[in-house]
Regions:
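Acidic, mature catalytic/reactive cores of soluble proteins
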Residues: 1-127
Length: 127
């Protein structure tokens, strides 16, 4: 069974911890997903690690990174930007609005990165 959890993932949040780093624990059916987030001090770097405990059948785990530019006081409306995606093995480089001096890098330990184009969230809000 595959559902669109992108906009409703918060409904599956079971717990939140913040000792040294934030840990979000989600429960979907019988699958437990822990998301650990760590930022490197003084750098524009973040690491997101997922730990999945699935004692049942095989499942598909899809991560959809959201790239968003907004003032932290406002809601994203209909602003669009261009993305250039470069994929080599398990490393992804994304350039936004043709600015190679500020790329986003992602490293994937398992699975595959799938390029997406024209995926836009309209009127995004945060709960």
């Amino acid at each position: 069974m595959c559902r669109d959890f992108i906009a409703s993932g918060y409904k599956y949040l079971e717990s939140f911890e913040k000792d040294y780093i934030p840990i979000f624990t989600y429960k979907v059916n019988n699958i437990t997903i822990k998301k650990l987030i760590c930022m490197q001090y003084g750098k524009n770097t973040v690491c997101v690690l997922y730990k999945i405990d699935n004692p049942g059948k095989q499942a598909k785990f899809t991560i959809t990174p959201i790239i968003n530019f907004r003032d932290f006081h406002t809601m994203t409306t209909n602003w669009e930007f261009s993305l250039k995606q470069n994929i080599k093995n398990k490393k992804v480089k994304i350039e936004i609005n043709d600015k190679p001096e500020t790329p986003i890098y992602m490293c994937i330990s398992a699975g595959n990165y799938i390029e997406h184009y024209n995926d836009v969230f309209r009127n995004m809000y945060y709960i």
